[in-house]
């Protein structure tokens, strides 16, 4: 039995391969035991994810419909106004989200983007929501700017194992990703980092991904586990389906290796039935994205999730929020930013 409160950062792929070989029921039982030793019972953290700049990404991630290299029918969209971000954040809070995540399809943000991003962070924080961004690679200076503006979390996934990585992405290295995570951590922000399974990887690659995450100098506070969403036009549109039990085992092992991290049941939920999702929660998942879309891919709507939570007796993580003060700030912000046309620009243009 694994010590269910100890944090280890010296895991080996061989050890994790052995965990994948455990009987399913035994593994899930251990994962649930670990979860109960570290988190409140029957409580799930709820986040909302908004695409603040969609499409035309120069990267070649083979799973991604936002890459400019693939014909997926996705239209390029401008960086959206700060006021629209604030409006979406208010709606997210009203439906029970405690964290608001903003994603931009960039290899990395440019300095000209930063003032708009910093305003978004400040306005979301004024609502009493935790804030998170995923913008691509960050240098030290950019990480410091985001941190100083109050950004709570920064997401930058490792995607897969180091050994399989160049089969999926060639436009940035694995070390680039690790360097960004180091810059985020050094700035004082919390780290959100996970990966995708079902990319055609071997079992040892799933083990390798989890080992990389668990053995970081400090384990991520949030670990999203994504199941590939196959999108027509991407190189992985015809990838073989990943067995649901393998996916659930991946969740369980993430919980065992990172006992104090939130493990997020992320992309791919729209294709999962309620029973599969319930087993993921049993295996230690305690975070989801709420809302009918994750950037550009489908996600269960809020009503479906609410019904599932009621069936399972799951509660949403509470919001510590004083509405009167924040609501006034947000309402004023919407008026203020609507009056500033310069806060809307095409971040993908070369001008």
From Swiss-Prot:
Pathway: Cofactor biosynthesis; biotin biosynthesis; biotin from 7,8-diaminononanoate: step 2/2. One of its GO terms (biological process) is biotin biosynthetic process. [2Fe-2S] cluster binds at residues 101, 132, 192, 264. The keyword 4Fe-4S applies. Residues 42-269 form the Radical SAM core domain. [4Fe-4S] cluster binds at residues 57, 61, 64. The keyword Iron applies. Its EC number is 2.8.1.6. CDD domains: Radical_SAM (cd01335). One of its GO terms (molecular function) is biotin synthase activity. It catalyses: (4R,5S)-dethiobiotin + (sulfur carrier)-SH + 2 reduced [2Fe-2S]-[ferredoxin] + 2 S-adenosyl-L-methionine = (sulfur carrier)-H + biotin + 2 5'-deoxyadenosine + 2 L-methionine + 2 oxidized [2Fe-2S]-[ferredoxin]. Its cofactor is [4Fe-4S] cluster; [2Fe-2S] cluster. Keywords: 2Fe-2S, 4Fe-4S, Biotin biosynthesis, Iron, Iron-sulfur, Metal-binding, S-adenosyl-L-methionine, Transferase. Binds 1 [4Fe-4S] cluster. The cluster is coordinated with 3 cysteines and an exchangeable S-adenosyl-L-methionine. Pfam families: BATS, Radical_SAM. It comes from the Bacteria. Catalyzes the conversion of dethiobiotin (DTB) to biotin by the insertion of a sulfur atom into dethiobiotin via a radical-based mechanism. Belongs to the radical SAM superfamily. Biotin synthase family. Homodimer. This is Biotin synthase. It comes from Psychromonas ingrahamii (strain DSM 17664 / CCUG 51855 / 37). The gene is bioB.
